[in-house]
Amino acid sequence: MVIKWSRFLVFCLIAFSLFIWMNTASSNASQGWKDFYKLPRNSVDVVFMGNSHNFETFQPEVINDLIPMESYLLGTSGENVMVSYYELKELLKYQQPRIVVLETFALDLSDLLAPSLMYEFLDASILNPDKLDLWLNYFDLKDAYNLFPALRLRIDWNQPADFFDSFIKTPGSYFNEIDERRGFLPTGRVMLPQEYEESLRLPGRESNYSLENNTHYLKKIVDLCRENDSQL
């Protein structure tokens, strides 16, 4: 009987380890968020927050060279200020920045450009009540399996090499040094004036989200910063 239970426990341990490995290998977490959890506690003086307008503009590596302070950049593609609020709550569990810079385009978005993009933030560490609360604003409990990267993974079996390469490299990624760009993502994309004018005429995406929610979450961000002695 003892041997059977021992085998069962060993099987569960191996299965759990493989599941965690698969979760990490198939994660959609951004490099900036993955590296964030490697930072020494309370080592960041200034944090830049927002969507792509944020992490394709501010360059902590340059700022840190010019000003005697440590800065870092966090955000996800197409996020609005609701996501910024939950990201700030997560950040404040590990850092106490003196200054929080929130780029204003996050305030202009009435909704996420694509809810699935929030996995750039959610996948970066273990699930907690705050992350679950954010997720429930956009998804139903019947889709809860999507909270686990391994369960929502769709491997392209025509070209599986990328996944297997990631799977093999996953254990070593925990020991990688923090990317010197510290969340900054350079881009080569340029929108021509004509393309910009055409984009202004595109119909808006239907949404039940109200801009009043942005004001609500901006106030919550202001309160969080005050409570933690961070200048916004």
Description of each model-found segment:
Residues 118-230:
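Secreted/periplasmic serine-hydrolase-like ester/acetyl group-modifying domain
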Residues 43-44, 69-70, 96-99, 226-231:
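Loop/turn elements at helix/coil->beta-strand transitions in domains of secreted/extracellular proteins
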Residues 49, 53-141:
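Membrane-embedded segments
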Residues 4-24:
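Hydrophobic membrane-insertion alpha-helices, especially the h-region
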Residues 31-34, 56-58, 86-89, 216-221:
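Alpha-helical scaffolding within the catalytic cores
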